[in-house]
């Protein structure tokens, strides 16, 4: 297998492994609040929003030290161990207790920080300036296809149900745990890419022995250097500007992955289909994500206009979705009690409009995330692990804040927050992309997505 083929193989395996893991985890997140509402009529008392706020809060706090972990153990082992913790969190729902539920939330927050830093590192070392756009699109399309498969099962299994029984819950989460473990094992199929500089004849065996004896010291040095780079990157102009865009992706991630499905499940006007519509919503979010990731991956070598038009498309698509949701969904839907809400917004709640908005949310999200992955891989190709750690730090802390306020804010206020951050995030991304275009003009052969 040629070096380029090996790198492409690694990207595909990386995407497929994440597809399995996040088929389980994103489906879990999408239905968690609905499942817990049903559990709260028993001895269990908890909040899916609070759990996700803990996950993303710990995730953000852990991100600045994860480059050190990845530098020492490597991306492959980092992703495998993280996958085990993801599986543990999902398994908690088989027989949940408040203490195990919230404890697992803490552990998966740490695991997520390691996982995504390692993923960014793996993506970058298997790409160059010519392939980073294509590889970002391939990975994103495979990752987001996870939304399709898990939610397809939820749609058919929960059709006509108004409450989630213990048998339904256990069946779903046992299956999701197994799926997550399959994805975790797939990380072992990723091969180490061929080094650019092969050991020359002039280097003696003594040199290799010396390297082996100094490996422990080198690991400590790598860890310290990675941590220092993370802190330095936080205050660079490009990263500060991209942080506004990243903050927006954290807010809208919270909305489409946890809040919107809960809103749909709480609208009594949807009748007996309200719970199964959660699954259908997740499917159409996934279709939007897959379409966007595939399209921008295929166009990565041919676009002459850079990333800005794609981000602008994402902004417009999201703003249309937010307006339609504002018209279609009752304001109290995110915080409705277990009985749901009978309120009506500005139009009678429409299933078709709700599902269209799901598709638009997914398409817009893919616009932002594929371009952020691409520009980070280009600007920080030598410091990929710290750069992706800072990216995930900002994204996750904003997601945590959003999950926290989702317990209290009415829907229209949540939409307003996202519109404000979306507008300024788009402007700040444009500024960084113009800088990247200037780098290209000075002599780089990089082709932007």
From Swiss-Prot:
Any one GO CC term of the record: membrane
Transmembrane segments: 8-28, 53-73, 74-94, 96-116, 138-158, 170-190, 239-259, 277-297, 309-329, 359-379, 385-405, 410-430
Coiled coil (residue ranges): none
Entry-annotated residues carrying Phosphoserine: 204
Superkingdom in the source lineage: Eukaryota
Disulphide bridges: none
Keywords: Glycoprotein, Membrane, Phosphoprotein, Transmembrane, Transmembrane helix
Gene3D superfamilies attached to this UniProt entry: MFS general substrate transporter like domains (1.20.1250.20)
Localization, UniProt: Membrane
Glycosylation: residue positions: 40
Tissue localization of expression: Widely expressed.
GO biological process, one term: response to food
Keyword GTP-binding: no
SUPFAM superfamilies reported for this sequence: MFS general substrate transporter
Family: Belongs to the unc-93 family.
Identification of the protein by name: UNC93-like protein MFSD11
Organism from which the protein derives: Mus musculus (Mouse)
Gene: Mfsd11
């Amino acid at each position: 297998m040629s070096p380029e083929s090996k790198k492409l193989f690694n990207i595909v395996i990386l995407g497929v492994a994440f597809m399995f893991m996040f088929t389980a985890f994103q489906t879990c997140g999408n239905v968690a609040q609905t499942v817990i509402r049903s559990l709260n009529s028993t001895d269990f008392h908890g909040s899916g929003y609070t759990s996700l706020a803990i996950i993303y809060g710990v995730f953000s706090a852990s991100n600045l030290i994860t480059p050190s972990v990845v530098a020492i153990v490597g991306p492959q082992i980092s992703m495998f161990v993280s996958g085990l913790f993801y599986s543990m969190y999902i398994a908690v729902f088989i027989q949940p207790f408040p203490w195990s539920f919230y404890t697992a939330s803490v552990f998966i927050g740490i695991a997520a920080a390691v996982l995504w830093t390692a993923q960014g590192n793996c993506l970058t070392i298997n790409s160059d300036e010519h392939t980073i756009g294509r590889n970002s699109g391939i990975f994103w399309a495979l990752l987001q296809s996870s939304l399709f498969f898990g939610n397809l099962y939820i749609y058919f299994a929960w059709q006509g149900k108004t409450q989630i029984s213990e048998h339904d819950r256990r069946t779903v989460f046992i299956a999701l745990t197994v799926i997550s473990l399959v994805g975790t094992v797939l990380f072992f199929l990723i091969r180490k890419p061929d080094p650019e500089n092969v050991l020359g004849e002039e280097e003696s065996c003594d040199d290799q022995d010396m390297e082996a004896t100094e490996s422990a010291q080198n690991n400590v040095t790598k860890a310290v250097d990675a941590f220092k780079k993370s802190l330095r990157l936080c205050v660079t102009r490009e990263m500060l500007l991209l942080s506004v865009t990243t903050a927006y992706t954290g807010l809208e991630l919270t909305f489409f992955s946890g809040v919107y499905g809960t809103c749909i499940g709480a609208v009594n006007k949807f009748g007996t289909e309200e719970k199964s519509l959660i699954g259908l919503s997740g499917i159409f979010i996934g279709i939007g994500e897959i379409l966007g990731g595939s399209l921008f991956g295929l166009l990565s070598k041919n676009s002459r206009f850079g990333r800005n038009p794609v981000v602008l498309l994402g902004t417009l698509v999201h703003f249309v979705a937010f307006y339609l949701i504002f018209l279609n969904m009752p304001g109290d839907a995110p915080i409705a009690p277990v009985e749901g809400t009978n309120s009506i917004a500005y139009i009678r709640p429409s299933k078709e409009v709700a599902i269209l908005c799901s598709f638009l949310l997914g398409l817009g999200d893919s616009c932002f995330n594929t371009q952020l992955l691409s520009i980070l891989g280009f600007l920080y190709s030598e410091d990929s692990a710290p750069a992706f750690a800072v990216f995930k730090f900002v994204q996750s802390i904003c997601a945590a804040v959003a999950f926290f306020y989702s317990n209290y804010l009415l829907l229209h206020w949540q939409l307003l927050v996202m519109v404000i951050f979306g507008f300024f995030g788009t402007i700040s991304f444009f500024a960084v992309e113009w800088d990247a275009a200037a780098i290209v003009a000075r002599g780089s052969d990089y082709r932007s997505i």
